[in-house]
């Protein structure tokens, strides 16, 4: 509320200035007002996939062994956060809670090679949201002095009756947003935390209407 009030005050002041300005300057002032407003405001982005509405689902996150070894909490964190977000915002009527899902996956390590219809039946859901991580790094190989984090993967939605995905998107986020940051400025935990948060946002936002800055950082 305070943010919108502040934006309104700035906009009102700029309008008063525009009214008092010569005709040729009004266009420039109005353009600057609009740009200033965008820089401090958000816009509504529509969902790209609404098929979880009225359905039950489970989120499955897969990564290679090296990634699992380097970041053992990565898959559980992504599974939990994305599952929670989708259940809260998509209108889904059922889900497999993250704690139960992670326990089931631990007890059934061959799930990665199990056909989607069989997996959906085992989990008792209508749809599977499958995330295959193909990269999660904090820096370029061989350069541990400069952070250059990246989290990337493929998100697919597969219905319980078939193996062909009904929705597929590539997710690719990075951090930091500028060069020159190393362990003296940011810890490895901070870089990993921001990467995971951004990946969760970009994965989850595909499924429901949400607000984003006009000029997002990721």
Describe these PLM feature segments:
Residues 20-23:
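C-terminal motif of bacterial Sec signal peptides marking the signal peptidase cleavage site
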Residues 74, 144-148:
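"Short basic amphipathic alpha-helical interaction patches in structured regions
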Residues 44, 114-116, 137-140:
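Short structured motifs
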Residues 53-134, 160-168, 194-211:
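N-terminal segment of the mature soluble domain
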